[in-house]
Amino acid sequence: MKPKLLFEQLLSRQDLSSDQMQEVIHACMTGEFSDVQIATFLALMRMKSETVNELTAAAKVMRQLAHKIDLGNPLIDIVGTGGDGRNTFNVSTACSFVVAAAGIKVAKHGNRSVSSRSGSADLLEQAGFILNLSDSQVQNCINQCQLAFLFAPHYHPAMQHARAARQQLGIRTLFNLLGPLINPAQVKRQVVGVFSTNWLKTIATVLANLGSERSLVISSQDGLDEISIAAKSEVVEYRDGNFKQWFISPEDYGLKHSSLDAIIVDSPEQSLHLIQSVLSGDSGPARDIVLLNSAAAIYCAKDGISFDASIEEARIAIDSGKANHCFNKLRLLTQTLNKESNHE
């Protein structure tokens, strides 16, 4: 599709067909479009607002172009779109250790920051984790720690063509929405946080279109892309071909309604400090938000468990020291694997 025709169509607020969307995403991901053309496309899509069909088509192209990794099943991913502008610490990354410590295999898909102060990769590198691992090394992490981090640039090399445009735009774009939809381990269960409740049903429907077995798509009424400790959060759950909407408040599960001030960070260093305090068993708002969001993943991963029981499993994973042990064990394992590969 010629860029001029594409831009005219989007300027007139006309949605793209699935075929058109696949063609355009392919052009963005193969260097056919320039940085200016990619940025223009992303900005116009944001103004028009992306549809279920457009996102499904885009995700299919991204999945086709990805370097896939087979880590077996069942697996879960806990991921947010980002773009909420709130600069909270890396909650979903912290939850990954808790959920893995609860005995659930986690394939955490993440990247460096584009629009926030600390992406999951920024935080993990600050903590000393090695992210550039081979497929067999990633499998080793899953086998030994129940958890592996899938560094997006390694699995989505085509994304390099859009990186400059995204960075120069500096705003939330289509790719924030796509990130949670293109886990290279092809997970069938996911907790996905979105930056606005307007996107809940859309993202849940796209996940269903892409073959998800079960998903929870979450947004809080104060604009977080996760379950909040400062407001009610809305959930759209997809399971067995059906969608269900429900709400979560911290008070419903014996947790305090708290200000977000205590969980805002300015850097990966601050985010790491908060995560380590939570995993060490410290109480407070950071622990509470990790409990709530870890519970969402446990609830999504395990059939027949209540949300109350999921909160308790998350609490035990932290207070037993297992989550902290998982953090330290995985960090050491990634360092050891990296040294071994460097000596080969």
Swiss-Prot record:
Anthranilate 1 binds at residues 80, 111. GO terms for molecular function: anthranilate phosphoribosyltransferase activity; magnesium ion binding. Its cofactor is Mg(2+). Mg(2+) 2 binds at residues 225-226. It comes from the Bacteria. Mg(2+) 1 binds at residues 92, 226. Binds 2 magnesium ions per monomer. The keyword Amino-acid biosynthesis applies. One of its GO terms (cellular component) is cytosol. The keyword 4Fe-4S does not apply. Catalyzes the transfer of the phosphoribosyl group of 5-phosphorylribose-1-pyrophosphate (PRPP) to anthranilate to yield N-(5'-phosphoribosyl)-anthranilate (PRA). This is Anthranilate phosphoribosyltransferase. It comes from Legionella pneumophila (strain Corby). The gene is trpD.
